[in-house]
Swiss-Prot record:
<dbReference type="InterPro" id="IPR035903">
    <property type="entry name" value="HesB-like_dom_sf"/>
</dbReference>
<dbReference type="GO" id="GO:0051539">
    <property type="term" value="F:4 iron, 4 sulfur cluster binding"/>
</dbReference>
<dbReference type="GO" id="GO:0016226">
    <property type="term" value="P:iron-sulfur cluster assembly"/>
</dbReference>
<dbReference type="GO" id="GO:0005829">
    <property type="term" value="C:cytosol"/>
</dbReference>
<comment type="similarity">
    <text>Belongs to the HesB/IscA family.</text>
</comment>
<dbReference type="Pfam" id="PF01521">
    <property type="entry name" value="Fe-S_biosyn"/>
</dbReference>
<comment type="function">
    <text>Required for insertion of 4Fe-4S clusters for at least IspG.</text>
</comment>
<comment type="subunit">
    <text>Homodimer.</text>
</comment>
<keyword id="KW-0408">Iron</keyword>
<protein>
    <recommendedName>
        <fullName>Iron-sulfur cluster insertion protein ErpA</fullName>
    </recommendedName>
</protein>
<dbReference type="InterPro" id="IPR000361">
    <property type="entry name" value="FeS_biogenesis"/>
</dbReference>
<keyword id="KW-0479">Metal-binding</keyword>
<dbReference type="InterPro" id="IPR016092">
    <property type="entry name" value="FeS_cluster_insertion"/>
</dbReference>
<dbReference type="InterPro" id="IPR023063">
    <property type="entry name" value="FeS_cluster_insertion_RrpA"/>
</dbReference>
<feature type="binding site">
    <location>
        <position position="41"/>
    </location>
    <ligand>
        <name>iron-sulfur cluster</name>
    </ligand>
</feature>
<feature type="binding site">
    <location>
        <position position="107"/>
    </location>
    <ligand>
        <name>iron-sulfur cluster</name>
    </ligand>
</feature>
<dbReference type="GO" id="GO:0005506">
    <property type="term" value="F:iron ion binding"/>
</dbReference>
Length: 113
């Protein structure tokens, strides 16, 4: 499913990194999937994986010719958020900036509502 008003931002930096990784894998059908699971030090944890398919009900956000996919259960926790890619002293990684999180852990990989 693709919405006209996109409730999640997929930054150019994240899209360009996904495009680079897809090229390295030599599989143009790959999409970056972001999801939420229980766990981490704050209750919920962000996860990222590559997926070849879009399931019924998934939201897709496209940028730079690549797709970010979010399942409906995870989307409710990510509305208004941003998926970005950062490079810094702590390494390179995809990150979620989530306005719905009431608190996050020090590394930013888990949050609470």
């Amino acid at each position: 499913m693709t919405d006209i008003s996109v409730p999640l931002t997929f930054t150019d930096a994240a899209a360009n990194k996904v495009k680079s990784l897809i090229t390295d894998e030599e599989n143009p059908n790959l999409k970056l999937r972001v999801y939420i699971t229980g766990g981490g030090c704050s209750g919920f944890q962000y996860g990222f994986t590559f997926d070849e398919k879009v399931n019924e009900g998934d939201l897709t956000v496209e940028n730079a010719g690549v797709q970010l996919v979010i399942d409906p259960m995870s989307l409710q926790y990510l509305i208004g958020g941003t998926v970005d890619y950062t490079e810094g002293l702590e390494g390179s990684r995809f990150v979620v900036q989530n306005p719905n999180a009431s608190s996050t852990c020090g590394c930013g990989s888990s949050f609470s509502i």
